[in-house]
Amino acid sequence: MTPARRALLLAAGGVALGGWSGAVRAGSQVEEPLADSVRSALSAAVADSGAPPKLEFRHIDERLAFLRWLGAMSPRLAKRKPEFNVRREFLETVWYEARRAGLEPALVLGLVEVESGFRKYAISSAGARGYMQVMPFWARTIGDGDASRLFHLQTNLRFGCVILRHYLDRERGDLFLALGRYNGSRGQAPYPTMVLGARRRWEFKDGPTGAVPSAATTPSAPASRR
């Protein structure tokens, strides 16, 4: 680990310990040319059947693990989303979309905190929309062209998670660079520092070993939504 990266991670820990107390000026994802194969893959990844979402689990242990996570996250989010049903729907969708894209739910929650402060209809000065501040050009590039759908809960989280996964793949797994690219500030420390710090506040330890459940340690998504 380089000294600069070590300093970044220490700073992220400091942000987490100090708490979050201010608005963030969201950057803007940069529209870049996409190869046809990449565009097709991303379009397929964000495709939505439009059916009502329903979590399904292969084993009872997976369901119990999800319920423990949900029980831990719900109180943490209560001040931001006081209505229980709204809060539960949001967390269920984060859980599914994060793991569908091979991301940690804690990372997605941290990014949402920094990007929008958990405001569904947030709009940045650059025009980014919704919880994960997705730029409208993505709706045209890999979606159906309707940018207003980016305010829909599942659509916004699906686009955001797929885009972050795309950037992680482009950066060969380097989270620091991928987060910077997501914000339009690749190579600069402030934004990744804030997201990494926020992620700390949404981590969940489960099981006898105290391991933090991670999409990276799960070969496939544990649940499906229909």
Predicted regions and their residues:
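Extreme N-terminal leader/anchor segments
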Residues: 32-33
